[in-house]
Curated annotation (Swiss-Prot):
It is found in: Secreted. Interacts with FCGRT; this interaction regulates ALB homeostasis. Interacts with TASOR. In plasma, occurs in a covalently-linked complex with chromophore-bound alpha-1-microglobulin; this interaction does not prevent fatty acid binding to ALB. Its main location: secreted. The lineage of its organism: Eukaryota, Metazoa, Chordata, Craniata, Vertebrata. Residues 19-210, 211-403, 404-601 form the Albumin domain. Binds water, Ca(2+), Na(+), K(+), fatty acids, hormones, bilirubin and drugs. Its main function is the regulation of the colloidal osmotic pressure of blood. Major zinc transporter in plasma, typically binds about 80% of all plasma zinc. Major calcium and magnesium transporter in plasma, binds approximately 45% of circulating calcium and magnesium in plasma. Potentially has more than two calcium-binding sites and might additionally bind calcium in a non-specific manner. Belongs to the ALB/AFP/VDB family. Zn(2+) binds at residues 91, 271, 273. This is Albumin. Plasma. PANTHER family: ALBUMIN (PTHR11385:SF15), SERUM ALBUMIN-RELATED (PTHR11385). SUPFAM superfamilies: Serum albumin-like (SSF48552).
């Protein structure tokens, strides 16, 4: 391999990109430039999302007013770039506008202190106050007729409310993708409000969209956490692996260019710079479509779409076919006598190339596994290149990957077998027991939320072909475990969880999988109130009923952490029978009052 050519290409792209950035920042008015690039509709939507993500407690009407004022100001600057304040940075303009909110101190407490800081510290301060768990009640949709009337009465306001409600609940949602989902939402109502049975049309379509939106939010939160906690290098490595799997015909220089651009886009969105993020994402889509011949044969269909659909299509595009003439990996990375020289001259480029070559050959591997293999390869070279005979030292490095590959394969196999046996709800309960014993200090709502999401991996991945299972499962687990890490970081209670979350991004899942029962945990005192139920349980939707039962299961385990699976099975079986009996009774509340204490006493006796 011609490393001089390779490295020259790498730096050529880096410098060309940097020059592009300098040109970008030379505009007289940044806000006018973004307004012109994005157009009024997308600009206003992004401003509404930005304010909703920063000021999560403010009413919708306040945000509409703020977004309107900023959009009008941008429009004026677009007409006359030398107008008053048009030359201010976007952070300054947005921060100044946030600090005009009269209720800032009352609603957000010490967040108001951010306004005493100067940029960029003020923006960093606002970012630090974003709340991943704002505690808003679940959204309850009105009747279909009322929804359709609201949609038809004022479509712009209706879609604005959608953006607001999602953004305030998900303060790191990928903003340009949220605009895309709002467009999908609009399409659902445009279709279903004409249907004879509006409810039958809306129900499944809204639920399918809701699932996509929740997954999109979790994925972007994972990306933002990767950037915030582990830096650009970790995010770029993740992106190289993912894009190399998806675009195996593209060369490493092309993948590197796209990864560099993609990293910038996500850094901007994670940093609250939504206008820049959306604009740069559109530019990246344009670049990919202009260069599709050197990236992938699968892009053409995406490139004929309008900008929002185009970017989304490119993000979800199917994997290209593998080139048929790929040489053995060993030739460049084991057998070449210059391995140590090439590694030491440009470590990140050499390791990036290894990751690229390995990933494009293994579309069946999870990104996390590919990164662990690259890390192992790096550690081997660090060790071997310091010896007298490096080639002998690293000769078997590719064979030594086997245990790292076997571990997630066996984990997925075992858990999919358990899922097939228990079904989703039973599988969730098994994970609840597992994770409560690993980290009993974590709050019960968090353990229930995370275990329910982990349990969905079975439904999502176990039905897939063997070649897709591991990639689906482990990458989904990485996203869900990130939710645990984000919530735990806010109120840390377990050193073991902190360790797994903070030591290594790629080893997070193996770290959690490897945790044993926490023997240092002091059991909670028994509280009968926790196990007291009322007739309202009977009318809850099935999912909420499951959460109530799972909450009781976690609390039982926190009281009796050494309870065996058989004991827990008995107690939860009794609990299910108790709920069924009382919900069928004529006097439901009377049944719960009378039978509840008996159940509690029986459970305590069974768990001795």
């Amino acid at each position: 391999m011609k490393w001089v050519t390779f490295i020259s290409l790498f730096f050529l792209f880096s410098s060309a990109y940097s020059r592009g950035l300098v040109r970008r920042e030379a505009y007289k008015s940044e806000i006018a430039h973004r307004y012109n690039d994005l157009g009024e509709e997308h600009f206003r939507g992004l401003v509404l999302v930005a304010f909703s993500q920063y000021l999560q407690q403010c009413p919708f009407e306040d945000h509409v007013k703020l977004a309107k004022e900023v959009t009008e100001f941008a429009k004026a600057c677009a007409a006359e770039e030398s107008g008053a304040n048009c030359d201010k940075s976007l952070h300054t303009l947005f921060g100044d506008k946030l600090c005009t909110v009269a209720s800032l101190r009352d609603k957000y407490g010490d967040m108001a202190d951010c306004c005493e800081k100067q940029e960029p510290d003020r923006n960093e301060c606002f970012l630090a106050h974003k709340d991943d768990n704002p505690g808003f009640p679940p959204l309850v949709a009105p009747e279909p007729d009322a929804l359709c009337a609201a949609f038809q009465d004022n479509e712009q306001l209706f879609l604005g409310k959608y953006l607001y409600e999602i953004a305030r609940r998900h303060p790191y949602f990928y903003a340009p993708e949220l605009l895309y989902y709002a467009q999908q939402y609009k399409g659902v109502f445009a279709e279903c409000c004409q249907a004879a049975d509006k409810a039958a049309c809306l129900g499944p379509k809204i639920e399918a969209l809701r699932e996509k939106v929740l997954l999109s939010s979790a994925k972007e939160r994972f990306k933002c956490a990767s950037l915030q906690k582990f830096g650009d290098r970790a995010f770029k490595a993740w992106s190289v692996a993912r894009l190399s799997q998806r675009f195996p015909k593209a060369d490493f220089a092309e993948i590197s260019k796209v990864v560099t651009d993609l990293t910038k886009v996500h850094k901007e969105c994670c940093h609250g710079d939504l206008l820049e993020c959306a604009d740069d994402r559109a530019d990246l889509a344009k670049y990919m479509c202009e260069n599709q011949d050197s990236i992938s044969t699968k892009l053409k269909e995406c490139c004929d779409k309008p900008v929002l659909e185009k970017s989304q299509c490119l993000a979800e595009v199917e994997r290209d076919e593998l080139p048929g003439d790929l040489p053995s990996l060993a030739a460049d990375f084991v057998e070449d006598k210059e391995v140590c020289k090439n590694y030491q001259e440009a470590k990140d480029v050499f390791l990036g190339t290894f990751l690229y070559e390995y990933a494009r050959r293994h579309p069946e591997y999870s990104v996390s596994l590919l990164l662990r293999l690259a890390k192992e390869y790096e550690a081997t070279l660090e060790k071997c290149c310091a010896t007298d005979d490096p080639p002998t030292c690293y000769a078997k490095v590719l064979d030594e990957f086997k245990p790292l590959v076997d571990e997630p394969q066996n984990l997925v196999k075992t858990n999919c077998e358990l899922f097939e046996k228990l079904g989703e709800y039973g599988f969730q309960n098994a994970l609840l027991v597992r994770y409560t014993k690993k980290a009993p200090q974590v709050s019960t709502p968090t353990l229930v939320e995370v275990s329910r999401k982990l349990g969905k991996v079975g439904t999502k991945c176990c039905k897939k072909p063997e070649s897709e299972r591991m990639s689906c499962a482990e990458d989904f687990l990485s996203v869900v475990l990130n939710r645990l890490c984000v919530l735990h970081e806010k109120t840390p209670v377990s050193e073991r969880v902190t360790k797994c979350c903070s030591e290594s991004l790629v080893n997070r899942r193996p770290c959690f999988s490897g945790l044993e029962v926490d023997e240092t945990y002091v059991p909670k005192e028994f509280n009968a109130e926790t196990f007291t139920f009322h007739a309202d349980l009977c009318t809850l939707p099935e999912a909420e009923k499951q959460v109530k039962k799972q909450t009781a299961l976690v609390e039982l385990l926190k009281h009796k952490p050494k309870a065996t699976d058989e004991q827990l099975k008995t107690v939860m079986g009794d609990f299910g029978a108790f709920v069924e009996k009382c919900c069928a009774a004529e006097n439901k509340e009377g049944c719960f009052s009378e039978e509840g204490p008996k159940l509690v006493a029986a459970a305590q006796a069974a768990l001795v």
